[in-house]
Amino acid sequence: MEYNHQEIEAKWQKFWADNQTFRTGTDKTKPKFYALDMFPYPSGAGLHVGHPEGYTATDILSRYKRAQGFNVLHPMGWDAFGLPAEQYAMDTGNDPAEFTAENIANFKRQINSLGFSYDWEREVNTTDPNFYKWTQWIFTKLYEKGLAYEAEVAVNWVEELGTAIANEEVLPDGTSERGGYPVVRKPMRQWMLKITAYAERLLEDLEEVDWPESIKEMQRNWIGKSVGADVTFKVEGTDKSFEVFTTRPDTLFGATYAVLAPEHDLVDAITTPEQVQAVADYRRQASLKSDLARTDLAKEKTGAFTGAYAINPINGRKMPIWVADYVLASYGHGAVMAVPAHDERDWEFAKVYGLEILPVVEGGNVEEAVYTEDGPHINSEFLNGLDKAQAIEKAIEFLEEKKIGKKKITYRLRDWLFSRQRYWGEPIPIIHWEDGTSTALPENELPLVLPVTSDIKPSGTGESPLANLTDWLEVTREDGVKGRRETNTMPQWAGSSWYYLRYIDPHNTEALADPELLKEWLPVDIYVGGAEHAVLHLLYARFWHKVLYDLGVVPTKEPFQKLFNQGMILGTSYRDHRGALVATDKVEKRDGGFYHMETGEELEQAPAKMSKSLKNVVNPDDVVEHYGADTLRVYEMFMGPLDASIPWSEEGLEGARKFLDRVVRMIDNSEISDKNNGELDKVYNETVKNVSERLDLMYFNTAISQLMIFVNATNKAKILPLEYANGFVQLLAPFAPHIAEELWVKLGNEAGISYVAWPTFDESKLVESEVEIVVQINGKLKAKIKIAKDLGRDELEKIGREAVAEALEGKNVVKVIAVPNKLVNIVVK
């Protein structure tokens, strides 16, 4: 048959759509399997070849599980709120909803062209009021539980974007992740979510999920649990004092100065007149920096002396109090006791300002370099000679006994800044009344629909563009009290924190989802997506899930039982002698090398992340047109382990297509028979066993290798049993579903391979029935023969003698050594 991929793929995509092949199964007697992709933001650029890698993995598992008799839930949707659509609307005057709908249509077309087995009846879109009604409902529950609150917060304000951004969206150089704009600190009224109330559970329950250890560790570090002590320091000559949290109370004897965050409440009260100007200037500079820029370990340490002194509570020594931006008001108490001998930042600061460095742990020369290793304590009175653990325990006992400190657990995790000064987001369902109260909208008034406007522009007040829409903004209560709707909208994280629940029951108008269906489908069995979401998205989704668990809405503590992060597909890039990247449209290939078209310089080829600026993005539409969706799927799964980052290769793509061509030829050209001569028994049963085991482990590349081994074996076989041809096509189907469907019908089967029971293997056939043995005379090889396995020594000797009968003529056989399944050695004279 001719392998016309375009015709074959269109034909079977239509068949699946017409027959609703991938509707989620509802047979209560079957086990369930929920395979979830991290849903995409539908950008104007459409899919690139990196997207299908994770989608292909979950699709393979979904097809495999259907054939194994599972009810499979495999949905797709759109994380469609977001700044790019709003920026586009502001730049062009077009409706972000229309722009988003066009992008979704394009994404959906591309996804369908790749043959993914999604149940489109369950499609969700975070911008659909029927979806965000429940996002708003969850917010009202957070509000009722005191987990959503308003606060004056110094936020990361980006003037060019007209909004505040989260700490995680600020780059180390102090610019915004989106657009690279300057970020300044600015106090604003913001909505916060109290994720810190769940810190311990978010930490503990990581033990219950099957996630990569590296991702768990990133979450643990982000939560940042610290066990230590709160210590009270008095300010000399005043009735003032301040608290410091330290994980190393054992080093108090080495605390030689104190540092307050520039925003600390005490700064104004304790700064001496001589230092007021210097401190004010310093605080102004600090306010322009992001938290990330302030705490960057590589940055030069700066500060200002307040003129005041603290008293070290453990030994009564005076300690100068400084203000420095490497201390954050939001962490601990916004104050640190500096132990420069044993802390990198404190040591650097002390060196810059000539402050005392007193070692209290033995080892190293602290005048030359900070010493951060463990060792016995010195210069520490009653702690001398103790190791770290003993000294910490004894120091805390002393502090508590003297009532100058107490044991404390803290977390690095901060409450979640939840509001954005944007139009294109979920409206926050809160009304602020003129009498100073605020109320959440009741459920029967949800969704609070985002008002349509053709003129999205900044409010000029720091509020979102919704502040301009007075008809929507201003409300009056039945008792005549006037109110104003909340103008902040939710961040893009909101919808993605619970969307996996809505897939379970997407058309329910009475509840977020039917409790019985949630019980049936949760938790998600496999969640596949990029490691860039390791901390934020996964932490936020886990937080919301735990709140919903406490409310009795969901039956599980954790949302995602197993997590897998696919690697990145890298593009080709070119670098000049300075290491600068050169866009691919400025490169020409000649004489086996790569050259800059403008300068003529020879360039070095290297893999790099695909990006529009480098013009090295590969569009899956082009690949599907020229090679076919099945080729793309097989190539992306065969290019290496799923979690590895691997460069895109046109040669690899061609190799995948050649493999599928060979599969077609195998079915076309083999003598397919109802009979079985046993030639392929071992390799076929090995193939069923190995492919099944490797699918369970998500070792897709080695599963494909095993399929290739089978195809190679058929080339040497006289016949291909029909049972084995059918079984092979079934094994191929999760990887290359279109061509598998076509070959399935060609083999005489009824159309539709998706629910045909997965092949099984015969354990007894995994063992060879024949073995090759060597026949030697006086230890020299004379023959190799195939014989039945496990023959006895007498039979072996007889067969061996017959095999070399001519060579034995006229010889005297002294003895025969027969080793079953290995050799016959005939000793002659």
UniProtKB/Swiss-Prot annotation:
Catalytic reaction(s) noted: tRNA(Leu) + L-leucine + ATP = L-leucyl-tRNA(Leu) + AMP + diphosphate
Cellular-component GO terms for this entry: cytosol
NCBIfam families, alphabetized: leuS_bact (TIGR00396)
Membership in a protein family: Belongs to the class-I aminoacyl-tRNA synthetase family.
Binding site for ATP: 612
Annotated InterPro entries: aa-tRNA-synth_I_CS (IPR001412), aa-tRNA-synth_Ia (IPR002300), Leu-tRNA-ligase (IPR002302), Leu_tRNA-synth_edit (IPR025709), M/V/L/I-tRNA-synth_anticd-bd (IPR013155), Methionyl/Leucyl_tRNA_Synth (IPR015413), Rossmann-like_a/b/a_fold (IPR014729), tRNAsynth_Ia_anticodon-bd (IPR009080)
EC number, as in UniProt: 6.1.1.4
BP GO annotations: leucyl-tRNA aminoacylation
Motif range ('HIGH' region): 40-51
Coiled-coil ranges from the UniProt annotation: none
Protein name: Leucine--tRNA ligase
Gene Ontology molecular function terms on file: aminoacyl-tRNA deacylase activity; ATP binding; leucine-tRNA ligase activity
Keyword Thylakoid belongs to the record: no
